[in-house]
């Protein structure tokens, strides 16, 4: 059965780089894995500010990345786990349509989908380093706030996770958990 590796952390913490490193290391060990594209980053590069506020749209596209390789690989590595739709829905809720549409039923759907999978949830802890605002909607300070919001969302929804500090050995530390 396919295991989902969810990398959690705010923008700029290194999720995409770590996901790429994990994909490389696992494939070098002849372990089948996939690292679907990070749909919110596509929206950021396209400067599509309205679409990022539509978390149903984001969720559907992120989930499609899982569906296309589920059952075909051993691991799917996500640098934008679907649970993040709960965090960003709350961030944009009440600001404008369509974010105002998504309430508790949306939350339940996101959690139900997440819970259907065999997940390894990894919360990345930010260390000092560079931050590229060109690929983001948030500043470094806003990203640090989101780090806390993400952890609070995991705790609030009783989602178990492992905490790993981001550093030179992060990829190797995660690989050791998997193989």
Give residue ranges: language-model regions.
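Hydrophobic anchor at the beta1->P-loop junction of P-loop NTPases
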Residues: 7
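Walker A (P-loop) phosphate-binding loop of P-loop NTPases
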Residues: 12
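Conserved lysine of the Walker
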Residues: 15
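Active-site flanking residues adjacent to catalytic metal/cofactor-binding acidic residues
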Residues: 37, 78-80, 124
């Amino acid at each position: 059965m396919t295991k989902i590796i969810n990398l959690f952390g705010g923008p700029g913490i290194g999720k995409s780089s770590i996901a790429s490193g994990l994909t490389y290391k696992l494939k070098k060990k002849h372990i089948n894995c996939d690292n679907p594209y990070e749909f919110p980053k596509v929206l950021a590069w396209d400067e599509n500010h309205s679409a990022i506020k539509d978390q149903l749209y984001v969720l559907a596209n992120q989930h499609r990345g899982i569906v296309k390789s589920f059952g075909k690989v051993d691991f799917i590595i996500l640098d934008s786990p679907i649970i993040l739709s709960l965090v960003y829905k709350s961030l944009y809720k009440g600001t404008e349509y369509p974010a105002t549409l998504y309430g508790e039923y949306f939350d339940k759907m996101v959690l139900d989908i997440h819970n259907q999978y065999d997940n390894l949830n990894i919360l990345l802890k930010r260390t000092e380093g560079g931050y590229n605002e060109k690929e983001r909607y948030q500043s470094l300070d806003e990203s640090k706030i989101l780090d806390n919001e993400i952890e609070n969302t995991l705790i609030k929804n009783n989602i178990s996770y492992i905490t790993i500090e981001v550093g030179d050995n992060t990829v190797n530390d995660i690989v050791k958990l998997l193989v």
